[in-house]
Design a protein with these regions (language model features):
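Alpha-helix capping/helix-boundary segments
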Residues: 54, 104-105
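Domain-level recognition of soluble alpha/beta enzyme cores
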Residues: 115-136
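Conserved beta-loop-beta/alpha segment of the NTase-like Rossmann-fold superfamily
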Residues: 105-108, 115
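Generic beta-sheet signal
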Residues: 3, 92-100, 104
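Conserved ATP-dependent adenylate/AMP-binding module captured primarily in the ANL superfamily
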Residues: 85-87
């Protein structure tokens, strides 16, 4: 499975955490990331997001460019772990995009990847290759 783990794009400040929207810069970051993925031929089977507004907006922008839909998942709310991500993506196809938060994204990438915690700026992304059913 190809898992694209993405931190939500840049969000405005000054609102309660659950209500923070993408800033104009964040909307542009999300569209640009969607275009980059499309240009690389990425065709996701699923786009899953944290239920928080800024993550949903990032997912919607990506999905619009990639001609698919995005779906919020409570399993990806702040505090998500590698185990909750694996549970959320199970059975979702061979190529899945997950949009979440920091520090969760870095910790999840380290646990599911090579143990190194990558830097995750807003709209930062890591591609991970996870074993599928019957592989190790």
């Amino acid at each position: 499975m190809r898992l694209f783990l993405i931190r939500h794009a840049h969000a405005e400040s000054g609102e309660p955490d659950e209500s923070r929207r993408l800033s104009p810069e964040g909307r542009e970051q999300a569209r640009a990331l969607g275009k980059r993925l499309a240009d690389e031929g990425v065709r996701p089977d699923a786009v899953l997001t944290s239920p928080l507004l800024r993550a949903r907006q990032t997912g919607d922008a990506l999905a619009e460019v990639l001609a698919c839909t995005s779906e919020p998942s409570d399993a990806l709310a702040p505090g998500a772990s590698a185990a909750t991500v694996q549970s959320a993506i199970e059975g979702r196809g061979e190529t899945v995009i997950v949009i979440g938060h920091q520090p969760d994204c870095g910790q999840i990438a380290a646990e599911l990847g090579d143990g190194t915690e990558p830097r995750f700026p807003p709209a930062g992304m890591v591609e991970l290759h996870l074993p599928g059913p019957g592989t190790s």
